[in-house]
Amino acid sequence: LDLNLTGKCALVTGSYRGTGMIIAQCLAREGARVLVHGLKAGQAEAAVEQLGLGEPVTGDITNDDGAAQLINQMAGSHIDVLVNNYGTADAGSWETSSSDEWVVAYQKNVLSAQRLITSLLPAMRDAGWGRIINLGTIGSTRPNARNPQYYASKGALATMTVSLAKELAASGVRVNLVSPGIILTPEVEAAYLARGQRKGWGSTWDEIEPHAARDIPIGRITRREEVASLVAYLASPLADAIHGQNIKIDGGILDIVS
């Protein structure tokens, strides 16, 4: 399936590592010109060298000055696709997280996206085409008690996506939210391997994963590549009728009708 992304330029925030890097790789494989983003000097350059693709850009988008730095670096490029992948799930609780930590979560998970949307949206409107894809979590619909500042901020990102979709009606710019459940990262795999071996589930990942995923209807944990493939499809002209949606990719965990 050709996603028709050749000639499109995509910025993937936080793509110097993890799921963001895999999203950048997937978009590049589909023909897009990809800007690989790091928050600190050297991060994006190292990722581009590792991947053998993309162009490095830098800016700490958790504050206005860093976002402006990033926008200035991209002054000669028209961004067709903005993937707001960057975000963090810092540990916390209702009794221990300070109000400052709540503000930090909002800066990282909401305003980092808002700053770039505000800056890049006028050119997308003028072009009559664009894609804005925000990375959320199923926790914005079903939050846990722990890390409340994280879930509250991701809930704000979800409602921001819907508000923006209404603003962009009939503009040619599409905006959606991708909400993964648990994703198989190296850290998740290592944690479950250690737990599984302690509990006697087995010694290999193939033996342990069915136990780790016992509450997931598909019987396994979602891979980062699957999230990247969904993002790439939403970034493409083929997804033109998908707008203002919160698309869950969780293996069927969130069994609700909405």
What is the predicted function of each stretch?
Residues E95, R142-P148, A170-S171, E189, ...:
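Active-site loop immediately N-terminal to the catalytic Tyr-X3-Lys motif
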Residues I133-A156, T161-A170, I182-I183, R214:
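Catalytic loop of short-chain dehydrogenase/reductase
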Residues N72, V81, A89-V103, D126, ...:
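Conserved mid-core segment of classical short-chain dehydrogenase/reductases
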Residues A169, R174, I242-G244:
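Short, small/polar-rich loop/turn modules that mediate ligand/substrate recognition or access, typified
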Residues G18, R142, R220, A232, ...:
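Short C-terminal tail/terminal secondary-structure segment
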Residues C9, Y16-R17:
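Conserved glycine-rich cofactor-binding loop
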Residues T88, E95-Q114, I133, Y150, ...:
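Catalytic Tyr-X3-Lys loop
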Residues P122, K166-E167, D240:
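Alpha-helical segment proximal to the catalytic Tyr-Lys
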